[in-house]
């Protein structure tokens, strides 16, 4: 099913975006302290 592949790909993309956001927030917090 192509829909499952699209959903899994979207989930992977969302997870990577959240990971980069958390990484940037932690980096900015380290620079603030």
Curated annotation (Swiss-Prot):
Entry's Gene Ontology BP terms: photosynthesis
What InterPro entries does UniProt report for this protein, alphabetically? Cyt_b6/f_cplx_su6 (IPR007802)
Which keywords, in A-to-Z order, does the entry hold? Chloroplast, Electron transport, Membrane, Photosynthesis, Plastid, Thylakoid, Transmembrane, Transmembrane helix, Transport
Coarse class of the protein's main subcellular location = plastid
Q: What domain of life?
A: Eukaryota
The record's subcellular locations are:
Plastid, Chloroplast thylakoid membrane
* Bilayer topology: Single-pass membrane protein
Annotated Gene Ontology cellular component terms = chloroplast thylakoid membrane; cytochrome b6f complex
Q: Report the GO molecular function annotations.
A: electron transporter, transferring electrons within cytochrome b6/f complex of photosystem II activity
- Enumerate the transmembrane spans: 4-24
Q: Which Pfam families match?
A: PetL
Q: How does it assemble?
A: The 4 large subunits of the cytochrome b6-f complex are cytochrome b6, subunit IV (17 kDa polypeptide, PetD), cytochrome f and the Rieske protein, while the 4 small subunits are PetG, PetL, PetM and PetN. The complex functions as a dimer.
Q: Which family does it belong to?
A: Belongs to the PetL family.
Biological role: Component of the cytochrome b6-f complex, which mediates electron transfer between photosystem II (PSII) and photosystem I (PSI), cyclic electron flow around PSI, and state transitions. PetL is important for photoautotrophic growth as well as for electron transfer efficiency and stability of the cytochrome b6-f complex.
Q: What is this protein called?
A: Cytochrome b6-f complex subunit 6
* Natural source organism: Pinus mugo
